[in-house]
């Protein structure tokens, strides 16, 4: 089993890779909205969105599983800590993002309603749904832990049971609630517990080649699913099952390959930095992706490949520069993304 130091670096690497997928996803999605006829951009966007957010949620579950059963904190205290570390940044970033969109509404030709600002507590603005959902997923996990600790304290297959339970809930309940928060829980809690399971599996795999075999197995399972995809597409239930299992399998593959490689090479420091301090990159990239797209369109540059490359590379570079030159050095701005750190509240 690997040391905690190696493990932290590997998780930072995984998060860094996922942030790059987030930026690329926002770039391709924007181009898809603009050029809906382009099959290439649609395909890239569909592939990215099939796994990158479930994998991000699995990372949170992976990290969470290290603190399961921590009796030093009560459930209320744990939820309050997450409120400072996730919910407070969600509110501040949402308000700032709304103000920016409102100020640039004429330029982006998209109406910005005051109602979207008022509804932030129950209806997230665009991409910020992830932070809102993540807080709810943690709350559910804390409450479930509380129940299990009192009713089944010695039950060894809690994570497996919860993963299967929320997989069933995803099929039966997702999209049926008026309140979006319940839909987030129904649709994504299973990936949170998938991350917990991955942590449990990796702790039992002492040999790097056993980890590699897990990656190979995930590829074989996914390949067989792709072969049968056409037969399953006619059945909505089978199609939904394929989509969710694809997200799970790709997530397992990313973890397994990353941990296998961690024993043979050092991950790029800049990618670990993006993963370690992912919040500013996640929050800012949409603005710069959209800005670059507007500038290129006004300059008469409509080539899809060029727009995609410029949007992805440009927004990543701008986010990096702002992070290194401003966010890290000005505590007030850093507070927007990491209030818990500034207030010395642990995660």
What is each model feature region?
Residues 30-35, 103-107, 171-178, 224-235, ...:
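Juxtamembrane "helix-exit" motif on the non-cytosolic side of transmembrane helices
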Residues 60-64, 136, 140-144, 190-202, ...:
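Transmembrane alpha-helical segments
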Residues 59-77, 178-185, 241-249, 258, ...:
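Cytoplasmic juxtamembrane interface segments
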Residues 185, 205-272, 287, 302:
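Alpha-helical transmembrane segments and terminal signal-anchor/GPI-anchor hydrophobic tails
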Residues 276-290:
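Hydrophobic alpha-helical membrane segments
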Residues 41-53, 118-133, 173-191, 225-253:
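Interfacial loop-to-helix transition and helix-capping segments at the boundaries
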Residues 121, 144-238:
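Aromatic-enriched alpha-helical transmembrane segments of multi-pass intramembrane proteins
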Residues 1-167, 265, 273, 299-347:
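Membrane-cytosol interface segments of multi-pass membrane proteins
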């Amino acid at each position: 089993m690997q040391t905690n130091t190696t493990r932290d670096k590997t998780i930072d690497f995984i998060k860094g890779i996922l942030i790059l997928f987030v930026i690329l996803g926002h770039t391709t999605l924007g181009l898809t909205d603009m050029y809906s006829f382009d099959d290439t951009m649609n395909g890239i966007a569909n592939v990215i969105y099939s796994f990158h957010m479930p994998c991000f949620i699995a990372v949170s579950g992976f990290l969470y599983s290290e603190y399961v059963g921590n009796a030093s904190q009560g459930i209320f205290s744990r939820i309050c800590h997450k409120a400072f570390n996730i919910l407070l940044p969600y509110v501040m970033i949402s308000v700032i993002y709304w103000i920016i969109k409102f100020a640039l509404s004429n330029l982006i030709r998209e109406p910005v309603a005051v109602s979207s600002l008022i509804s932030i507590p129950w209806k997230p603005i665009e991409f910020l749904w992830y932070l809102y959902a993540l807080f709810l997923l943690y709350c559910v996990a804390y409450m479930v832990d509380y129940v299990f600790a009192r009713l089944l304290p010695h039950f060894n297959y809690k994570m497996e049971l919860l993963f299967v339970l929320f997989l069933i809930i995803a099929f039966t309940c997702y999209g049926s609630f008026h309140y979006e928060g319940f839909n987030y829980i129904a649709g994504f809690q299973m990936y949170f517990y998938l991350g917990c399971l991955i942590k449990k599996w990796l702790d039992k795999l002492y040999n790097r080649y056993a980890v590699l075999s897990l990656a190979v197995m995930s590829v074989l399972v996914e390949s067989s699913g792709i072969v049968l995809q056409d037969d399953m597409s006619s059945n909505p239930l089978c199609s939904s099952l394929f989509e969710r299992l694809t997200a799970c399998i790709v997530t397992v593959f990313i973890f397994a390959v990353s941990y296998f490689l961690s024993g043979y090479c050092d991950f790029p420091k800049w990618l670990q930095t993006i993963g370690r301090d992912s919040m500013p990159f996640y929050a800012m990239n949409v603005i710069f992706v959209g800005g670059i797209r507007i500038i290129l369109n006004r300059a008469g540059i409509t080539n899809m490949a060029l727009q995609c490359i410029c949007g992805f590379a440009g927004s990543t570079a701008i986010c990096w520069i702002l992070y290194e030159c401003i966010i890290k050095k000005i505590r007030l701005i850093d507070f927007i993304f990491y209030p818990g750190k500034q207030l010395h509240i642990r995660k």
